[in-house]
Amino acid sequence: MQSSFKTVPFTPDFYSQSSYFFRGDSCLEEFHQPVNGFHHEEAIDLSPNVTIASANLHYTTFDTVMDCGGGGGGGLRERLEGGEEECLDTGQLVYQKGTRLVGGGVGEVNSSWCDSVSAMADNSQHTDTSTDIDTDDKTQLNGGHQGMLLATNCSDQSNVKSSDQRTLRRLAQNREAARKSRLRKKAYVQQLENSRIRLAQLEEELKRARQQGSLVERGVSADHTHLAAGNGVFSFELEYTRWKEEHQRMINDLRSGVNSQLGDNDLRVLVDAVMSHYDEIFRLKGIGTKVDVFHMLSGMWKTPAERFFMWLGGFRSSELLKILGNHVDPLTDQQLIGICNLQQSSQQAEDALSQGMEALQQSLLETLSSASMGPNSSANVADYMGHMAMAMGKLGTLENFLRQADLLRQQTLQQLHRILTTRQAARAFLVIHDYISRLRALSSLWLARPRD
């Protein structure tokens, strides 16, 4: 709303204490406590109905709260610059904070300060025309300033507290992340340590196996050969145990791929891996046969139920094909013909090897029975040693029989892999593993049976 102003010429007869001063054209405001001296440039008339406008500071009185918006400030400047003389209805003193020098030094009203000062002006009305500011007015003015400072301090404290809380949360998150990182690092270091130990064990076993192989090839003394054979058997059984664990893992992956309808390309990778793993066990058996052929023939490295169905150190290929024929379907006519031919050829090869084993046993029996009962004389000693050399030569063929049997089993699996599709081959490998697992479970039940 509009307010009346009256411009009074400046005289040195009016003095007052100033609480604000300005430097140059800057809007920087500085607050200081009243001083004992009076400044000639800041002298104003504090009479209730007079407004004094000077070139440096402007003090106005209002009969009501002044509208300090952008328009009000401009109107005030125009009246002060034009020298309009208007009177106010009441004598309320207002100190204007937030003025700045514009052009010739005319101040503009700061809206936020006008609101605060207008509220204080309502509480500091005067009824007399004194040249000194009343103590109550100064107290109210200082109280208003202190209230504003207190509100500012409270706001600053709230901001600092909020910032501290965010900092604490961030520190807690950083500590948690660091803890998890330490745990991951510890697990990684432990894994590296386990891998190092495992590698050292493998290197030691490989070194021992090489030493054993060199002993066997060189034909060292009987005691050393027996020691090498014993260590070779132990190494084979250890490697076979690891092979079973790895084979179980591969079968689990293959079963998951079949159940999840994995693509043919990805499934083919798993099937080829299982086939390659079967090739590995045949290689290990070949090494074990060189070390101790009778141990491999007896199948002491297998469970009792597996030994019951064992033929020349392993399974019969023809029986395995019969099991697969009932579980791998549907098969095309060409696949059925291929499997039938494979089964017939496997059966014929098994019969031939079985007949060869029978012939070997009969030949050994005749050789050992035709020799004299003991080397009592020099002639008998020569005859005895001759027959024992013949028997040793015939036993040498036993190793060939076991190799031929393992080769038949390996070729049967490879032919089956080529006849079947990728998905059918995957199911075939699962059926073979499940069958052997049932034999092992049967052996465990048999060994755990109660004995009266």
UniProtKB/Swiss-Prot annotation:
Basic motif: annotated span: 166-186
Assembly: Interacts with GRXC7/ROXY1. Interacts with BOP1 and BOP2.
UniProt-annotated location(s): Nucleus
InterPro entries: bZIP, bZIP_sf, TGA_domain
Principal location listed in the UniProt entry: nucleus
PROSITE patterns: BZIP (PS50217), BZIP_BASIC (PS00036), DOG1 (PS51806)
Protein name: Transcription factor PERIANTHIA
GO biological process: DNA-templated transcription; regulation of flower development
Keywords, ordered alphabetically: Activator, Coiled coil, DNA-binding, Nucleus, Transcription, Transcription regulation
Protein family according to the UniProt entry: Belongs to the bZIP family.
GO cellular component: nucleus
Annotated segments matching region Leucine-zipper: 192-206
Cystine crosslinks: none
All copies of domain bZIP, residue ranges: 164-227
Source organism of this protein record: Arabidopsis thaliana (Mouse-ear cress)
DOG1 domain boundaries: 233-449
Function text: Transcriptional activator involved in the determination of floral organ number. Acts to determine floral organ patterning by establishing floral organ primordia in specific numbers and positions. Plays a role in regulating stem cell fate by directly controlling AG expression. Binds to the 5'-AAGAAT-3' cis-acting element found in AG promoter. Might represent a target for a post-translational modification by GRXC7/ROXY1.
Disruption phenotype: Mutant plants have extra floral organs. The modal numbers of organs in mutant flowers are 5 sepals, 5 petals, 5 stamens, and 2 carpels in contrast with the tetramerous pattern of the wild type.
A Pfam cross-reference name: bZIP_1
GO MF annotation: an example: transcription cis-regulatory region binding
